[in-house]
Amino acid sequence: MEKYFNKTGYLFAGNAVFVEELYRQYLANPNSVDQTWQEFFADIKDNNALLNKSTAKVIRPNPNVTKALLNNNLSYEGLHNLKAKEMISAYRRNAHYLANLDPLGLEIRKTKDELKLNIEAFGLDSSQLEENINITDEFIGTWNCKLSELVTKLDKVYTSSIGVEFDQIENVEEKNWLYTKLETEITFASEEKRSILNDFVEVECFEQFLHTKFPGAKRFSIEGGDSSIVAMNKAIDLSMNQGVEEIVIGMAHRGRLNTLTKVVGKPYKAVIAGFINGNVFPDELNISGDVKYHLGYSADRVRANQKIHLSLADNPSHLEAINSIVAGKVRAKQDMLVDTKRSKVKAILLHGDAAFCGQGVVAESLSMSPLTAYNVGGILHFVINNQLGFTANAADTRASRYSTEFAKIIAAPILHVNGDDIEAVLKATDIAVEYRQKFSKDVVVEIICYRKYGHNEGDEPMYTQSKMYNIIKSKPTPGNIYANELVKSGIIDNNYYAKLKEKFKIKLDKEYEQAKSYKQESHFLGGCWKGISRTRGKAAITGVNKKILQDLGTKLCEIPKDFTINPKLVRLFEVRKNTLTTDQPIDWATAEQLAFAHLLCSGTNIRLTGQDSERGTFSHRHSILHNQIDDTTYIPLNNLSKTQAQYEVANSNLAEYAVLGFEYGYSLASPKNLVLWEAQFGDFANGAQIIFDQFISSSATKWLRMSGLVVLLPHAFEGQGPEHSSARLERFLQLAAEENMYITYPTTPASIFHLLRRQILESIRKPLIVMSPKSLLRHKYAVSKLDELGENTTFIPVLDEVTKIDKNNITKVILCSGKVYYDLFAKRVHNSNIVIIRLEQLYPFEKTLVASLLKKYNKAQAFIWCQEEPKNMGAWNYIAEHLNDALKEAEINNEFKYVGREESASPAVGSLQVHNKQQEKLLMEALGDDIIK
């Protein structure tokens, strides 16, 4: 049999099982196989001996595959076609390694032999290249052709300037659609080609203009990656054609100035003015501002009868931090438009290669993308791969060939494209835009390009990448390359490109002259922010008629008769209902629910997410009830009335950074909604520290971007160790300045009721940081009367002593915040001469209110600040100066003394016994002889 194999190229080892199965059929019934095979097998001697030696004893064919592939009429031609189809599949999987992706030509590409993409790997040889094959329905535009023609077409599609990775996609429909689009040739009309060249000219000339006028000034040029701006422009135009009404863009600093002008539509003179006088906001706003390449902008793009609103988000230099923020903004806009198909508003994110594979928030954000609570219908990602991360080479920043491996965790299609081939870039963009709109999923286009200068224009790249930059120095620009192509094809003449550049240079010169006297505009408090104030007004009345609260609370306790809830919850709702109807004091969870309920009935949408937020980490909220019989759910807060607003509550994925960023972004686009993020424990909030530092605390003074986001951080020292005790209150207080946010540590249900409602009823929007309770959720003293939530009531930032004590007999005044109050209260003896005052709001510090209370007790000899946290943590370092200033205002010649835990590197001890001893010690020191022994 061997001699026949040697003579027949289509019989190779990979077909052993196939041939053996045919041979078995032949032995059983010679007429069951094709005549060609009958003749072949008839020449074989010693049939039984050959069969006994076959590998079929070891390797058994899949009967389903065998049945599908081996029909009675399979011939040489059929096998030949099968091999061709296998080659197509292999090209689709692996030919991206052969693609010409590097415009600098530095990459050493693999060969067909290495990748087993040569025809011999499929049991074919050069003698068969002119033979006809039939691959109907397998390869677009090719049905009956020669094998050589198929190889040529495969090489053109898969090994030219685009390399694709679609194998991670499980959905067959999506995968086939992508291959069809890729294998379909697209052409550009002459006018389109000239328009593309004009885009190149505007991108290139603006960068060169700034380089000449402001030498050495940082601008993070996009030169070398010019095609990314052209591609983004194309993506927007394509989106307009698909009915998209708004696009939110997020990106880092490289190429931002060109994106602001060329893409979003900011006047060139506005950007140039920032270079001339350094001002990027009107002086009268009196804000700190930010550098030019961090700023955002919004404008409408109008074309014929179409209009689309474009927004470029402000962001810091913390790469990729903007990703989930943009997603949150898009989701909020979609929700406001009731865009359930998520097709009217979309996001475009631009990433750097080193950042995309290096920053963990990328994986967090991508993982969120398909989840119901965070789905925005897919994001279009452009990865601008300039093959460097500051001074680090690609090999220093990742182990993989591509920077886009993270995208595979959500099975996103990835198209890699050579940035010097603009028509290939635009084809990839066209596929990506249509895919996102059709399948509502993320898609990635990686543009491999280069960076003309160093990390910034003052940096010298020759120190570290001399070989690369020697190539770049002599390299024509992408625009120049394309212009030469158009000249060769006769679309433009030799002078066309130069004339375009000269014409645009004249425009920029005019913009430069106008920039000298240009007055910056703020574009502040427009759109959905109309009616919101920048400054605090009179304190909002946040109370609600008691009867209304009782009715709402009772309604929340009504469960449908055919809905079976857990018996423990039955009891909980019975107790809660009885508490409300009999006018007894309510707990924290009830107060929160009542605050939500009245806001919803007043037309305010509410969104709350976080790890375990549906039930609540401490099993107190139970926003979503689960039927014990089946998997159905019931949300009481969405069943108050037919005209109420929407309550959305969701458990987040196990991430802080991206999730908090998403909710912050959501709050930026929905100032009339109450948006909350809750940490599982406050200790874990520092996983999102960048969002707190770069956005929540500082966005108003840097970018004039306000947020009303509420952050709930469970915080208290209860013997649970260093990872479940502290939300790092001190860090938030360190960030507090210019009345940038509210920082609170409330102790009563009434306080949280008013705080939540204040976020909406005030005319201003500021983030609210809440050190929320754990054990106080069920503490017998941590309750409030409904009258404290009633009409004409409001949030009280400082709570006076609750017991009747003769102020003339007071010897000591203790100020504190949070849970420690109840520890002090429980340990203080009856008829004590010590008063305990609570600061429900730590920032802004209400000095006048505190001073008025201190003056009331001006005969006291000792003034103490008591806290549970170590001395170097908690509020002490922030509040000591403020408290002493309040004493001065009260005309009391004294100072506050610290009582609390000693300084510590760790927030809390791991031993419950040690914790209890520490707690007892600080209580004894605070109360002295007035402590219950």
Curated annotation (Swiss-Prot):
Protein name in UniProt: 2-oxoglutarate dehydrogenase E1 component
Gene Ontology biological-process entries: glycolytic process; tricarboxylic acid cycle
Similarity annotation: Belongs to the alpha-ketoglutarate dehydrogenase family.
Cofactor(s) needed: thiamine diphosphate
Summary of the function given for this chain in its UniProt record: E1 component of the 2-oxoglutarate dehydrogenase (OGDH) complex which catalyzes the decarboxylation of 2-oxoglutarate, the first step in the conversion of 2-oxoglutarate to succinyl-CoA and CO(2).
Quaternary structure (record): Homodimer. Part of the 2-oxoglutarate dehydrogenase (OGDH) complex composed of E1 (2-oxoglutarate dehydrogenase), E2 (dihydrolipoamide succinyltransferase) and E3 (dihydrolipoamide dehydrogenase); the complex contains multiple copies of the three enzymatic components (E1, E2 and E3).
Species in which this protein is naturally found: Rickettsia typhi (strain ATCC VR-144 / Wilmington)
EC class name: oxidoreductase
Domain of life assignment: Bacteria
Catalytic activity from the UniProt record: N(6)-[(R)-lipoyl]-L-lysyl-[protein] + 2-oxoglutarate + H(+) = N(6)-[(R)-S(8)-succinyldihydrolipoyl]-L-lysyl-[protein] + CO2
Any single GO CC term annotated in Swiss-Prot or TrEMBL for this entry: cytosol
Gene Ontology terms, MF aspect: oxoglutarate dehydrogenase (succinyl-transferring) activity; thiamine pyrophosphate binding
Annotated InterPro entries: 2-oxogl_dehyd_N, 2oxoglutarate_DH_E1, DH_E1, KGD_C_sf, ODO-1/KGD_C, THDP-binding, Transketolase-like_Pyr-bd
Its EC number(s): 1.2.4.2
Record Pfam families: 2-oxogl_dehyd_N, E1_dh, OxoGdeHyase_C, Transket_pyr
